[in-house]
């Protein structure tokens, strides 16, 4: 959504000599929040500034995002505006982007494209060797997208 943007940073290493030597490690996860009662332009500025900070902190080689679908929802325009800010910041850092549909993420992590959110979250915890499901949901979703990019590479 627009009020909360989840992020998840992982380190992925492919071992060319050993098919089973690939590894993935959690760096961090969290959310960027923009309070609902704040004027739109300030919310977009917060998103812009905070996303720059996250990118500078983790210096990613690749960014994976969820594909945006237009629903008949009143917040579609707001989400599209936030997405524009996200793409702008990623472009300013010259970062390659991969996008995945929700069904691709579910299929990759849970084994089928209509999996429940809880099944995907449990898969995230398992793949990252965590004894807990990352919270909030937006951060767990971001980690699911990051893992999907890793598995699809």
State where each predicted segment sits.
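Phosphate- and other anionic-substrate recognition elements at nucleic-acid/protein interfaces
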Residues: 2-153
